[in-house]
């Protein structure tokens, strides 16, 4: 891959992927921005009830044949899908970076973790054998078999547009379910490319569908009786809402809300190792991940000055700019609203008595002068 991907492209429309085909939909759209430039990259369709119904019908109709497909045949498709993901890794990572903003190294790491789940799904046939117990009772043999649920739905966040969907759909589909993915409308393109690659690998039409949309699309998915299971990763308020709605409608639900994490550095800690861990946890992917240190780092008075000094030195060495430039260590936050929110946190901390040791608000990056924040460090005793 070249040192910098060309991010200057014509604005285009992003639709859906239903029944093995790209589906155009220009009725209601939302802008998709390149966070590194602040420019509109595309317009993504926001599916209405009729489009959602088509995706559900496609998945529902495909379920009977797919659940009857031999596990070994499914595995062959998954091996091919894994191969295509690796062959198209550069293209997938470029889409992640152009729409999310994270640097290419972070995008590659994300994709790699997702492919690990696909690899695990390649061995799913060993997990579908059920159980048999001879003589469980007098003249009684006991056996059980594992059966797919039906049409499953995955609703995923913006911060890991490849990895989090791959937590969900490979396992569901390998087990004989069909699937509808509703990715974040902020960075939808990588999900559509994955759907195309899956079908290229031999997945029958309708087994994997992608519907772009907002709350209206989610509500339509949660209300339809043909949906058997829902998986969600995102903010806690939405996780709670989705759990209530989906369980009320009789669906199996797993809903993972946001995390609030802190770190504690003990007096006998390896300071250099601790600082390296803090750098990755606090600033990796611009801190836009659930396992980021989003609350506080607790340090005793004896170590605080040493840790802050080492952090400050490492921060000064980092290069910040568009994620498409492989020489950069950190890219932009995904939206201007996200940048403003983090800036407000800094101002709130100062108002509450914190000392601003490193102020990241004055960073200027050519081409998007107001779109970037540098790392910041606040200290409070």
Which residue stretches match the model-derived regions?
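Terminal low-complexity tails and localization/encapsulation signals of metabolic enzymes
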Residues: 1-43, 76, 80, 130-156, ...
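Residue-level signal for inorganic ion chemistry
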Residues: 38, 74, 96, 118, ...
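Glycine-rich loop-to-alpha-helix module at the N-terminal edge of alpha/beta enzyme cores
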Residues: 39-128
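Hydrophobic face of alpha-helices
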Residues: 56, 75-82, 93, 111, ...
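Generic secondary-structure signature for well-ordered alpha-helical cores
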Residues: 61-68, 83-90, 101, 116, ...
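Conserved residues at the C-terminal ends of beta-strands
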Residues: 124, 155, 214, 233, ...
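Rossmann-like NAD(P) dinucleotide-binding subdomain of oxidoreductase/dehydrogenase enzymes
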Residues: 130-275, 327
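ALDH superfamily catalytic-core signature
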Residues: 237-381
């Amino acid at each position: 891959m070249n040192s910098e991907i060309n991010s200057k492209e014509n604005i285009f429309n992003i639709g859906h992927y239903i029944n093995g085909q790209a589906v155009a939909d220009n009725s209601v759209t939302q802008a998709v921005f390149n966070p590194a430039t602040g420019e509109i990259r595309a317009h993504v369709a926001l599916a209405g009830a009729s489009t959602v119904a088509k995706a559900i019908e496609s998945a529902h109709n495909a379920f009977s044949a797919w659940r009857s497909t031999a596990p070994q045949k499914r595995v062959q498709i998954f091996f091919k899908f894994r191969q295509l993901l690796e062959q198209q890794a550069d293209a997938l990572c470029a889409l992640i970076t152009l729409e999310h903003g994270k640097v290419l190294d972070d995008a590659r790491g994300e994709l790699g973790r997702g492919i690990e789940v696909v690899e695990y799904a390649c061995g799913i046939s060993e997990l579908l054998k059920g159980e048999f117990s001879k003589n469980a009772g007098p003249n009684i043999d006991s056996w059980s078999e594992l059966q797919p649920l039906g049409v499953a739905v995955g609703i995923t966040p913006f911060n890991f547009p490849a990895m989090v969907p791959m937590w969900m759909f490979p396992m569901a589909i390998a087990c004989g379910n069909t699937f509808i993915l509703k990715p974040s409308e902020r960075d939808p393109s990588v999900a559509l490319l994955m759907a195309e690659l899956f079908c290229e690998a031999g997945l029958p039409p309708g087994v994997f569908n992608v519907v772009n949309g907002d709350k209206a699309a989610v509500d339509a998915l949660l209300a339809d009786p043909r949906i058997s299971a829902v998986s969600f990763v995102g903010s806690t308020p939405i996780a709670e809402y989705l759990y209530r709605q989906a369980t009320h409608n009789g669906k199996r639900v797993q809903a993972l809300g946001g995390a609030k994490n802190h770190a504690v550095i003990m007096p006998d800690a390896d300071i250099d190792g601790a600082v390296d861990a803090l750098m990755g946890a606090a600033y990796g992917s611009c801190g836009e991940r659930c396992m980021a240190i989003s609350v506080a780092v607790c340090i005793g008075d004896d170590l605080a000055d040493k840790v802050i000094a080492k952090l400050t030195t490492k921060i000064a060495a980092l290069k910040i700019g568009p994620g498409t430039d492989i020489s950069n260590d950190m890219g932009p936050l995904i939206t201007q609203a996200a940048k403003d929110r983090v800036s407000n946190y800094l101002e709130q901390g100062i108002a509450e008595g914190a000392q601003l040791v490193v102020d990241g608000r004055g960073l200027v990056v050519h081409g998007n002068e107001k779109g970037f924040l540098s790392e910041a460090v606040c200290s409070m005793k």
